Amino acid sequence: MSLRVATTAALALVASASLGATRPDGLGDVVDIQHWSYPAFSRVVIQLSEPALATVGEVPADPAGDKPARLYFDVPGMWVGRRFATPIRVGDGLLRQVRVGQNTLDTARVVLDIERYGRHRVMELAAPARIVVDVFAPRQQAGGAGGGRAEQHGAPEHGAELLPMDLRPVRVVVVDAGHGGRDPGAIGVGGLREKDVTLALAKTLRKSLRARGFEVVLTRDRDRTLSLEERTAIAEGAGGDVFVSVHANASPRAELAGVELFTLQENAERQTLRLAARENGVAPAEVDPLQRLLARLRLTEAGARSSLLAKQVHREIASGMGERWPSAREPALKQGPFYVLYLSDMPALLIEAGFVTHRDDAYRLRDPEYLRAMAEEIAKGVERFRDEVAPLVAERRP
């Protein structure tokens, strides 16, 4: 994605009909616009029918003309049509509205009218093609006006401080129960559904983390459908300091078993790519383009801190579960291209708690005592990260 700063104060959105011609051949579509709002964070997702490289521009506010600051995205090869003739009202204290129109005959334009602005982040994702735009409040204003749905998820007020990640205390843990609602996830032995395992483990993990003084936000506490973008929007909106996504694995090879922990990495084994394809909701053939996309990832403190977090959790699971469940296999620590980790701007970890397709693993994943033991070890690892590792990272900051 290319970036440029607009120098003109005018941003025209031309209605498709006024261009005087029928839709040109070979264009894709702007399929949908979604948004999620929180006090210090807003996310807009521009869904496209096919991948496209957008140009990003910024226009400062014009108080004399009563025009807000704007971010705009020119998306070549896209057609808008009439469905977006009316602006999409946001009104969350950060974004006023989203406007969509045809900039030229073969280029769509999406404009974000901004009320408050600190910084923004743009990510292009594939399968399905979409552009994810995150707008953050100014640091000194974070936690102010802005409404939004974070309150429904128990977001703590301090979570919007927006300090550099390696200077923030680790207080809020966001636990993401994978899949849910229309998406059952993997289905294994005896009809065991991944979405049921993840929800049970997430709720149990919440108890273990709270017992250690953490504030905990669940992305879902019931059987409901959530997109990957919404899961991480909940995490960002809650001011999460750590993001833990829990899943259950599956394989056509019934002998595969054990716990696996993943941090983000674009280069991965073929088996991990197949797993990432399932968790990302893309076909295996689409994972290699996904790898090329993730190859452009920024290398931030969050990435390094994710590895440190994973090592602590892995150590606790390996020692604690090995003592209490000697038949369970040694957990593996791996890396893979998971969207849910890419979309999070905080230390993030994805845990596959076992294989629903393995007889013994499936039996354990149905056992509340096993899930309690797993939750305890995960919580111990996060606690160790908070108390021992994170402070050392902050001390080493130049």
Predicted feature residues:
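Bacterial N-terminal signal peptides
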Residues: A6-A17
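Signal-peptide-cleaved, periplasmic/extracellular N-terminal interaction regions immediately downstream
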Residues: L19-V173
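Flexible glycine-/small-residue-rich
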Residues: L48-E50, V75-G77, I114-R116, D134-A137, ...
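Hydrophobic anchor at the start of a short beta-strand
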Residues: A54, V216, A348-I351
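Short glycine-rich, acidic/polar surface loops and turns
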Residues: Q97-V98, P331-L350
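Catalytic-core regions of hydrolytic enzymes
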Residues: G148-K311, R315, E323, Y363, ...
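Histidine-centered active-site loop/cap adjacent to the catalytic His
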Residues: L371-R386
